[in-house]
């Protein structure tokens, strides 16, 4: 049975500590590192992570792998996977997370791939379809989202949900059994 959680996109706005700081503190405390491969979010997650002073202690780097060629060339996503499943798929999100983790030799890899719109949607990958991938060398997690809103809103929601889900992985919350239904 799948349980639902609701993520309030602005939950960290009014608190004294933002989620990117919480993530950074947890990574630093545990001696772990992170690398990020972004497609549909265009570097916005890296921007949030590096807003924290001292983030170079745990954030090794990131890439915007917007084209299929970049996904294959720089982080090792097999072009056959892209052809077979599409660039916006759980398989590609998984490979991106694994590939960026290997490329930067980090504990964790995080990835995003999706269709932010307003054009580019297909029956297989409609506007608002996003996959977020996480890899730690032993396990890989992928979360599928179907978001509504403008291009900017879809990107913003993807960033917030990515950070929230990653914080759950770091704190060993019951990530795999939760279905995310973002507000807004």
Annotate each predicted stretch with a short phrase.
Residues 7-184:
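Short alpha-helical segments enriched in small residues
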């Amino acid at each position: 049975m799948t349980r639902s959680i609701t993520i309030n996109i602005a939950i960290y706005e009014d608190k004294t500590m933002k989620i990117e700081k919480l993530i950074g503190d947890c990574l630093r405390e545990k001696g772990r590192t992170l690398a990020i491969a972004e497609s549909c979010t265009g570097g916005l997650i890296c921007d949030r992570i590096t807003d924290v002073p001292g983030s170079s202690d745990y954030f090794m780097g990131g890439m915007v792998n917007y084209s299929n060629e970049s996904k294959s060339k720089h982080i090792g996503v097999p072009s056959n996977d892209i052809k077979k499943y599409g660039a916006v798929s759980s398989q590609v999100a998984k490979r991106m997370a694994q590939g960026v983790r290997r490329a930067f030799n980090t504990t964790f890899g995080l990835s995003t791939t999706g269709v932010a719109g307003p054009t580019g949607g297909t029956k297989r990958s409609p506007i608002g379809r996003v996959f977020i991938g996480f890899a730690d060398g032993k396990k890989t997690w992928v979360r599928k989202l179907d978001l509504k809103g403008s291009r900017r809103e879809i990107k913003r929601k993807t960033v917030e949900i990515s950070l929230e889900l990653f914080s759950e992985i770091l704190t060993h919350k019951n990530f795999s059994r939760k279905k995310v239904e973002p507000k807004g």
